[in-house]
Amino acid sequence: MSKIVKVIGREIIDSRGNPTVEAEVHLEGGFVGLAAAPSGASTGSREALELRDGDKSRFLGKGVLKAVAAVNGPIAQAVLGKDAKDQANIDKIMIDLDGTENKSQFGANAILAVSLAAAKAAAASKGMPLYEHIAELNGTPGKFSMPLPMMNIINGGEHADNNVDIQEFMIQPVGAKSLKEAVRIGSEVFHHLAKVLKAKGLNTAVGDEGGYAPNLGSNAEALAVIAEAVKAAGYELGKDVTLAMDCAASEFYKDGKYVLAGEGNKAFTSEEFTHFLEDLTKQYPIVSIEDGLDESDWDGFAYQTKVLGDKIQLVGDDLFVTNTKILKEGIEKGIANSILIKFNQIGSLTETLAAIKMAKDAGYTAVISHRSGETEDATIADLAVGTAAGQIKTGSMSRSDRVAKYNQLIRIEEALGSRAPFNGLKEVKGQ
């Protein structure tokens, strides 16, 4: 009942109005899986390749007809007749057929869409929700947890058209007793933040991930206005709500220095920028910092881990790009203590699960993440619960492409009840 009988690829539109790949996998029992590949703005140089057409007459060169053709042609032919329940085999067939180190032949967007669609179809054929099927693929059947959300309520960097250098300022509703309550707290703080910004005459337009994108005097001011909003919403900063940041520092790393254009082009060495961040953690209850230095600055990261690694969570995104080879090297060298998991960075579900397992086995945390270019596909919600990852980053409290994931988590929590505990701050490394 779970043999693949048909695979369809198509070009659809993501949350930024750019094309992406959607795949449909049909099984002989009439079961169907549908999945779409997300797309990033600030991307690590070692990510698997997102194949774009480059034809300037269509979608400004961003079309994905080549990737779609790969789905409908060689990929479909290779997986027809194969058992969708054998995820590792499906993914291996596609990866081997592609034959490149970074999936540049077919595109990680093509391979991932089929990989996820096959998993969804297999779950349907087993008569179980996707998160349950993922837990079985993960070798942890029946082991679930609800993730602590990191909600990106102020967007800067590559995610917004403003003068804020640091890409994401996030809140974590750690005082919540459930995922549903965490979403409510996040929503209330988000709405109070709008009032705080308006009172200061600041813009409340939103960025790619649904957070506000005002022009601010400094990066520290972003933390200050969030602190004000938390208080206005009736919560205590540090107790009910903690803070997190994604620096995406590779985006402002120029000629060996970290240059904050929004702060008068202040330039920092790796050590100086580490202490700049350390000062912020002393002023505000920041418990997690992602990509605090450039992806290639491993010596700097070793220093940053030494200074901050026993106090807070240091997440590698561009640093590790969900790649087990790079993560293994990072673990051996004691770089960071957490990995961001974006399945389109590596391009298949099997490899994503391997990265999560490697991180957990080494005592690193794993934070499941969206991309800035998303669709209504909410697979990452099931991935977070099915791997009991403990943390999720899926944007702010606006834009359906973000909220779709929170709504799916609410449904899953309702279905699982006490089988999926919400552990809050305990999930964060160093807390």
Curated annotation (Swiss-Prot):
Q: Which SUPFAM superfamilies does UniProt cross-reference here?
A: Enolase C-terminal domain-like, Enolase N-terminal domain-like
Catalysed reactions, semicolon-separated: (2R)-2-phosphoglycerate = phosphoenolpyruvate + H2O
Q: What pathway is this protein a component of?
A: Carbohydrate degradation; glycolysis; pyruvate from D-glyceraldehyde 3-phosphate: step 4/5
The entry's localization annotation reads: Cytoplasm; Secreted; Cell surface
List ligand-binding residues for (2R)-2-phosphoglycerate: 167, 342, 371-372, 393
The keyword Metal-binding is assigned to this record: yes
Known role: Catalyzes the reversible conversion of 2-phosphoglycerate (2-PG) into phosphoenolpyruvate (PEP). It is essential for the degradation of carbohydrates via glycolysis.
Protein name (record): Enolase
